[in-house]
Amino acid sequence: MSQNEAYEPGPDRGLERTPPQDLNAERGVLGGMMLSKDAIADVVERVKSTDFYRPAHEVIFESITDLYSRGEPADLVTVSDELTKKGELARVGGGAYLADLIDMVPTAANAGFYADIVVERATLRRLVEAGTRIVQLGYAADGGEVVEALNS
């Protein structure tokens, strides 16, 4: 190995890593919410739509919480209908995907635990984003921007 090769990014040095996320936990949250109104009440106290890594999950979550806030049931039929009205059903994977979300959940009682995982991964992603921004500022040619960012 040449000296230059030692400094080249390798496959395991991962400059292009996947951000922290747990898609199974996200699916578990959404499936649990569609199974139980109590799960919705538990989850909405912990999770924001932006905590979801997968954009389709964010859209599904928003539809569930919209229905819940209007006092309507949020189950497979009503969530599918809500997404259809918004023109989003196909984009999130269709009715079959929503059914899969429900089928994969062993019990709606675990939705709160899954929500904690989703929030934890979202917090880690935000830390990675902040760290990346700090690195970018450190390499910026204009030191004034760095000082301004540190003081804010």
Regions flagged by a language model, labelled:
Residues 100-152:
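Interdomain "pre-motor" coupling segment immediately N-terminal to P-loop NTPase/helicase cores
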Residues 1-122:
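Noncatalytic partner-interaction/assembly domains of nucleic-acid and motor enzyme complexes
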